[in-house]
UniProtKB/Swiss-Prot annotation:
Pfam families: DUF6501. InterPro entries: DUF6501. This is Uncharacterized protein YozC. The gene is yozC.
Amino acid sequence: MIHKNWLEKETIKKVKCVQTNAKKYIVNRVLTPGKEYEVKNETEEFLFVVDNTNKVGGYYKEYFEEM
């Protein structure tokens, strides 16, 4: 259950949100375009970042650009 420690885990890198135009999910409530986010984990398709709710959430990489 590695996901339970992600909030305290060291930040891997920082990314900047570039858009929140989701086709299937509502992400504009938890991500803000132009804001920087800490990446706690990464997979091929998703970044797990500390979002605007101060919780770790998984989002498609297409919403971000690397800093």
